[in-house]
């Protein structure tokens, strides 16, 4: 009898508690500025957190159970680890698609960290995340317009195509025509992205931190920190618009010799807000569409050189770097001036899109990063160690850092032959690099933890550019490294000349500049010989 009474009391308390919580929640939702959005947040966030918890637990258990009792370094352990990596990558992929929003962005980040995370994760994310982003309905697009400008798309523009031409993790792009007849691209943020971003970031933090506690070698908290810092800026399209204009201004002021070959769309400020960005519509070929580039009368080789020089100038001279240069964000078109190269082919102009993610390098970081690349190109082991340590790699991981930057083993990095940094892109090279990433997973994770976040974004940028140049040059990388060597050397020398020095030190810098130019000329000539030999053997 007493037990039944106690049960009834507990039941009543549960009912009253549920009613109070439900009533309070309903009152909170009803009194909010946007009840429908608040309701969606209150129902979706717990579900996402639950999915994160289940996925993290499943991945952790799989690694712990599957690798139990397998000897470190054995072929059996390597085989099983590959299978676990693949299963875990697929679970993470499924989580990203189900949760959407910044989870897609996280998956895209992982897909671009080639040789920094296990190859199974990179391949799984790259095959899906870059081409299968969510699409907002036209009704959701109209909702964003109403909130931002108080009008529907067909009122703001003379014409507005309701079907997007492209969609990414944070936004999608529509073609429109202004009332004065200009064709424009309108970037529309996915509905409620800003509302869910903070909660999603916290939920992702639970996932990453949980995996790190279980597996200390899995330390990708830096990726979470980077997303937490970058995401608010990427979600503000007015920041992107300012980056767009600053990028072009830097080329005009600091790199006038290539300024006419680099372009970014004109921004229509009167038709832009933090969630709507209206810009000039750009025609051209995607940078990895080699066939279309050739049809435009442009040599892919010229495009590869322009891409390498453009981003080398950003990194080593401007200190203001576009950190998401994947193929969809780079368009090639014939230079509007009509200029041609010595072979009569049209010169390319590189159009850079999506300026939401930029990083600034302070003077010391930029100087050391430029000095490191100069040392890598010229096989200077002492300088590689010195500047790697100054960037945070330490005296125990500088060799690994050099390998990650160049994608070559140490013995090849310090080889003094002119083609020591060539990557042919064949299956043997790719397999070697993938094995390298898997074998040194713990060391790579520790290195990434040590390096400044801005350098981590430079690594991601390097991977994107390497992928683009591999497609343009069919795997050959020497020309790109020579351009990097030239621009990084110029940046180092400019920094040294800017210091107040004695006549003797000034002469030393002058001689260093002369020596660098001579070495680069010899390397360029050797490259020409290699290219002639290659053409004769075809």
Curated annotation (Swiss-Prot):
Disulfide bonds: none
Signal peptide: 1-26
UniProtKB keywords: Signal
InterPro entries recorded: ABC1_dom (IPR004147), ADCK1_dom (IPR045307), Kinase-like_dom_sf (IPR011009), Mito_struct-func_regulator (IPR051130)
Family annotation (PANTHER family): AARF DOMAIN-CONTAINING PROTEIN KINASE 1, ABC1 FAMILY PROTEIN
Family of the protein in this entry: Belongs to the protein kinase superfamily. ADCK protein kinase family.
Entry protein name: Putative ABC1 protein At2g40090
The organism's taxonomic lineage, starting at the top: Eukaryota, Viridiplantae, Streptophyta, Embryophyta, Tracheophyta
């Amino acid at each position: 009898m007493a037990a039944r009474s106690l049960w009834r009391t507990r039941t009543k308390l549960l009912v009253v508690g549920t009613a109070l919580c439900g009533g309070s929640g309903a009152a909170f939702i009803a009194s909010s500025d946007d009840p429908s959005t608040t309701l969606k947040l209150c129902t979706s966030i717990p579900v996402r957190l639950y999915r994160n918890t289940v996925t993290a637990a499943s991945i952790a258990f799989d690694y712990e159970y599957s690798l139990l009792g397998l000897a470190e370094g054995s072929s059996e352990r390597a085989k099983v680890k590959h299978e676990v990596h693949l299963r875990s990558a697929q679970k993470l992929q499924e989580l990203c698609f189900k949760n959407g929003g910044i989870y897609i962005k996280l998956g895209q980040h992982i897909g671009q960290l080639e040789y920094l995370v296990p190859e199974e994760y990179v391949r799984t994310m790259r095959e899906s995340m870059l081409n299968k982003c969510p699409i907002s309905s036209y009704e959701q697009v109209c909702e964003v317009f109403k909130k931002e400008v108080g009008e529907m798309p067909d009122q703001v523009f003379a014409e507005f195509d309701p079907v997007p031409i492209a969609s990414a993790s944070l936004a999608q792009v529509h073609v429109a025509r202004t009332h004065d007849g200009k064709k424009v691209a309108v970037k529309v943020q996915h509905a409620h992205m800003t509302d869910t971003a903070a909660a999603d970031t916290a939920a992702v933090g639970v996932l990453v931190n949980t995996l790190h506690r279980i597996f200390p070698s899995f330390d990708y908290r830096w990726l979470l920190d980077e997303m937490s810092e970058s995401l608010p800026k990427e979600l503000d399209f007015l920041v992107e618009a300012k980056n767009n204009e600053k990028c072009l201004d830097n080329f005009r002021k600091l790199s006038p010799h290539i300024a006419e070959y680099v372009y970014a769309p004109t921004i229509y400020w009167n038709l832009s807000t933090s969630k709507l960005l209206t810009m000039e519509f750009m025609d051209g070929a995607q940078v990895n569409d080699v066939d279309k580039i050739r049809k435009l009368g442009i040599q892919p080789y010229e495009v590869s050189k322009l891409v390498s020089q453009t981003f080398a100038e950003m990194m080593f001279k401007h200190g203001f770097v576009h950190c998401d240069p994947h193929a969809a964000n780079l368009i090639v078109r014939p230079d509007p001036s009509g200029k041609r190269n010595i072979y009569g082919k049209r010169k390319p102009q590189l159009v850079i899109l999506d300026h939401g993610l930029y990083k600034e390098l302070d003077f010391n970081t930029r100087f050391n990063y430029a000095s490191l690349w100069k040392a890598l190109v010229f096989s200077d082991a002492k300088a590689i160690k010195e500047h790697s340590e100054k960037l945070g790699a330490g005296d125990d991981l500088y060799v690994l850092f050099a390998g990650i930057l160049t994608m070559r083993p140490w013995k090849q990095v310090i080889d003094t032959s002119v083609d020591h940094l060539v990557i042919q892109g064949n299956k043997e090279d790719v397999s070697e690099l993938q094995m390298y990433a898997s074998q040194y997973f713990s060391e790579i994770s520790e290195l990434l933890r040590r390096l400044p976040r801005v350098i981590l974004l430079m690594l991601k940028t390097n991977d994107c550019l390497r992928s683009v140049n591999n497609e343009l040059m069919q795997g050959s990388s020497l020309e790109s490294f020579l351009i990097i060597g030239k621009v990084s050397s110029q940046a180092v020398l400019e920094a040294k000349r800017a210091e107040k020095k004695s006549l003797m030190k000034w002469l030393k810098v002058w001689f260093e500049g002369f020596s660098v130019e001579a070495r680069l000329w010899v390397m360029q000539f050797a490259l020409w010989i290699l290219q002639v030999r290659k053409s004769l053997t075809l």
